[in-house]
Amino acid sequence: SGYIRQATGYTPPVKGLKDGETAKHAINLGLDADIANKEGYVLTTTSEGIQINGQTENGVFYGCQTLRKSIPAEAQGADILLPAGSIKDEPRFTYRGMHLDVCRHFFPLEFIKEYIFPLASDG
């Protein structure tokens, strides 16, 4: 909900659902043991809503990051239309990494925090 608010200025309501239950015209999150990779996910958009399934909570998290990055930058206060489709994604490697050369340059702590954030958010 917070990621959608950041991108659009709109805070969608959050509602808990029972296993197997979905809500129409909503973003539904779920777990799917059939997804092979622990961080893999399937993001499906239709006229009925958005479904993000991951094998684990991490997979759902990365699916949410993909949805967040799919929202146009100029979406603040505007209607958002996403094309219908399905994205199946999983990491190629079991690790994520970036390199920051702290040996030759001094970096303030705040910069390092901003540098590390994309590792978790995938963007």
What is each stretch, according to the model?
Residues 91-123:
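Substrate-binding cleft of carbohydrate-active enzyme catalytic domains
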